[in-house]
């Protein structure tokens, strides 16, 4: 029997202003070179811009965007008998949210624009509406999983 204890899963802390875990997850993913205060500034400016654009609660727009981008299934490369297959696997909610945040930031960074806050707010609003590069990435992942459905038994 293993002597290692079970590791309890860490819960994400909430940010100081909105008291929201998703905002803090976003801050931790946008963080570069340990500059957390700059990451908070970018997020809070983006949230203000969302408020100005949509005139609704920006946190609900953020939640809706992340829910829209969160994938249900993904593909994982699995080597079987000398050839590599893309095997579709189901994704849990925590991992799905992490992927959604990663894709949203990737799409925002790819956008042309003035600054990161503007690009992020535009991407979040688009994702909440059901368009944008992050949504396209999710649909592409789902298409890949559907195309490789025959390899699902390799799990």
Curated annotation (Swiss-Prot):
One of the primary rRNA binding proteins, it binds directly to 16S rRNA where it nucleates assembly of the head domain of the 30S subunit. Coiled coil: none annotated. One of its GO terms (cellular component) is small ribosomal subunit. InterPro entries: Ribosomal_uS7, Ribosomal_uS7_bac/org-type, Ribosomal_uS7_CS, Ribosomal_uS7_dom, Ribosomal_uS7_dom_sf. This is Small ribosomal subunit protein uS7c. One of its GO terms (biological process) is translation. One of its GO terms (molecular function) is rRNA binding. The lineage of its organism: Eukaryota, Viridiplantae, Streptophyta, Embryophyta, Tracheophyta. It is found in: Plastid, Chloroplast.
């Amino acid at each position: 029997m293993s002597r290692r204890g079970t590791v309890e899963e860490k819960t994400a802390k909430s940010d100081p202003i909105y008291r929201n875990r998703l905002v803090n997850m976003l801050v931790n993913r946008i963080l570069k070179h340990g500059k957390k205060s700059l990451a908070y500034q970018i997020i809070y400016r983006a949230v203000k811009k969302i408020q100005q654009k949509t005139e609704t609660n920006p946190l609900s727009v953020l939640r809706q965007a992340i829910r829209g981008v969160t994938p249900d299934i993904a593909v994982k490369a699995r080597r079987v008998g000398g050839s590599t297959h893309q095997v579709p696997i189901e994704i849990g909610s925590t991992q799905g949210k992490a992927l959604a945040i990663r894709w949203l930031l990737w799409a925002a960074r790819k956008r042309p624009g003035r600054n990161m806050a503007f690009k992020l707010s535009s991407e979040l609003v688009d994702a909440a509406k059901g368009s944008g590069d992050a949504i396209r990435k999710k649909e592409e992942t789902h298409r890949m999983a559907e195309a490789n459905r025959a390899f699902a038994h390799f799990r």
